[in-house]
Amino acid sequence: MLDPGHNLNNSSSINTIVNAGNGVFKACDTTGTSTNGGYPEHAFTWDVANRAAALLRAEGATVMLTRPSDSGIGPCITTRAQIGNEAHASAFIAIHADGGPAGGHGFFVMQPPPSNPNVNPGGAAQSRVLATVMHDTFHAVTGYPYSTYIAGGYYPNSTITGTINLSHGPVITIECLNMRNAGDAAIAANPADRQRIAAGITAGLTAFLST
């Protein structure tokens, strides 16, 4: 399951506060961040997710996306997790780009805490395996550096995202780059670099499913 983070339109419906799990309440969804040049996160994640889906399908994988287009509203973060749960997804990858400090660059991976009450038995442990494999493989395939502002490129014990909190199986979020950094913004806007990012995600997921 690939989850292209955020959506195009920011209407009152996505500002509704929902229970995002683990005691977290937040907006149903948002439009995300953007580069200083105006390239939006939702467009980046949609493009990368579709590129990764094509690569995975070429390898024979069955791939679902949590939203059908880049022109609508939603779905809510709660619904995105539900889509993965109902599909009994072997892995749930939430694809994002960060809006971090302008002086920071690189990617990082977010993983749930061991005590996540929503995961199936072993799901949290498998999420940590998925996070480690994606962290190492994405770096090796893309050559992109680990985040300079998130230690080691890991955000452990994350409870800030609804998809991580509410997913039952292996789940991570990958923040592929920092859109507020000029160098990373140039990568985000380059189709060839987005293809490289998709290849890194594909390789990480394939490696995890082979473990």
Residue ranges and their predicted role:
Residues 4-48:
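Active-site-proximal loop motif in hydrolases
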Residues 39-211:
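Active-site-proximal helix/loop segments of hydrolytic enzymes
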